[in-house]
């Protein structure tokens, strides 16, 4: 009886002495659940008239808790990094809106709104109006969100940039792969919005993504 009591005491003590540690989910080759983490709108000063199938290409990586995605298409290279995060990018889609605006939908493995991260965006003009760095600073907040976002724009082709994190709306007509499940933030107050403009008012950089047609970015 005494032996059993001592054994139970040791087991209980061992259980309380183990420190809880976060674990990192093992990487998958093909993620089935896509979270709509961000929508990026970019205005350019050359003509882009409609969504082109097969125009966008992507590569992604996850190194030292930093999730990175690089997109090329429509004369732009977009490089985005979410720092110190458990999630990684799984997919992206691009669509062309009115007045030479490009909309980019970004999908990750989990939501952003519970843990706030630092975000870095680099946009480079690849085909027209290439040149020196036009803008290198924080992206101002238009809706309060406990994240910082810095942006670098290389070249002079960009007229405006707007980034919305944890959007509450998703394009119902987006033809995502049938074996994927899309989900998104449903709490209006958990969104974040950042924007900068060089020509028009910032509200001219906003698009109704429900009216656009998108094509998924192909992996390189």
UniProtKB/Swiss-Prot annotation:
Keywords: Early protein, Glycoprotein, Host endoplasmic reticulum, Host-virus interaction, Inhibition of host NF-kappa-B by virus, Secreted, Signal, Viral immunoevasion. Induction: Expressed in the early phase of the viral replicative cycle. GO terms for biological process: symbiont-mediated suppression of host NF-kappaB cascade. It comes from the Viruses. The keyword Glycoprotein applies. Homooligomer. Interacts with host CD80 and CD86 when secreted. This is Early protein OPG038. The keyword Membrane does not apply. Plays a role in immune evasion. When secreted, inhibits T-cell activation by preventing the binding of host CD80 and CD86 to soluble CTLA4 and CD28. In the infected cell, may inhibits host NF kappa B activation. Pfam families: Pox_M2. It is found in: Host endoplasmic reticulum; Secreted. Belongs to the orthopoxvirus OPG038 family. The gene is OPG038. InterPro entries: Poxvirus_M2.
